[in-house]
A protein has these predicted regions:
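Proline/Glycine/Serine-rich low-complexity intrinsically disordered segments
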Residues: 1-196
Length: 196
């Protein structure tokens, strides 16, 4: 039987390590730091990094990271978005990290900041929930955030050494196409509430 458990972002890895959950499917990047604590499937998604701004804000016409110079910004704590991407913005006023994706979106909506950096699925869902947001996607251009594949490859985490579950998950993932992943992601974005 499948049981879905809602956890805070910082609880995901400990929940897998302790056996509270068998696996985590939550947009986790397969970083070397996380791989020291849990095992990962092959990547099932590559999440491009995007920026959200208000559609009527000062940065709505930005075409590159350079165009965000001086922006007041934030993102979710313990993510590549906050730790690596925000510091790439010249003269950025980086606010403290937010505890969750919903919290960073509220910071943007309330005017505490002019931009948040996140991944494409979160950004797409945010634009549904907040129609006054604009998604800026610099991926594939020279003006994009500099990130490695490790930073954006998304996998399912399992307890270290649980090869039986890891092999079973990889077996299913191996049969899926890029179109399958896109369809599932689009559906998940359409039904995922952006609330705490």
């Amino acid at each position: 039987d499948l049981e879905i458990v809602k956890l805070d972002w910082d609880s995901l890895v400990p929940a897998v390590q302790s056996g509270k959950v068998d696996c985590v499917i939550a947009g986790q990047s397969i970083t070397s730091e996380r791989q020291q604590m849990v095992d990962f499937t092959e990547p099932y998604y590559y999440a491009s990094i995007i920026t959200l701004v208000k559609s009527d804000g000062d940065y709505a016409d930005a075409k590159s990271v350079a165009d965000l110079k001086g922006v007041t910004c934030t993102s979710q704590q313990n993510t590549i978005w906050y730790d690596s991407c925000l510091p790439q913005i010249e003269d950025a006023n980086i606010l403290p990290a937010q505890e969750s994706a919903p919290a960073m979106l509220v910071a943007l909506e309330s005017g505490k900041c002019d931009a948040v950096v996140t991944d494409m699925p979160t950004g797409m869902a945010a634009c549904v929930a907040y129609p006054d947001f604009k998604l800026l996607d610099f991926s594939g251009t020279d003006g994009d955030f500099e990130v490695s594949d490790e930073d954006i490859n998304i996998g399912i985490s399992v307890q270290k050494g649980n090869t039986e579950l890891l092999d079973a998950l990889n077996s299913v993932l191996d049969k899926m196409t890029e179109d399958d992943y896109k369809e599932m992601m689009d559906e998940a974005i359409s039904v995922q509430p952006l609330s705490e």
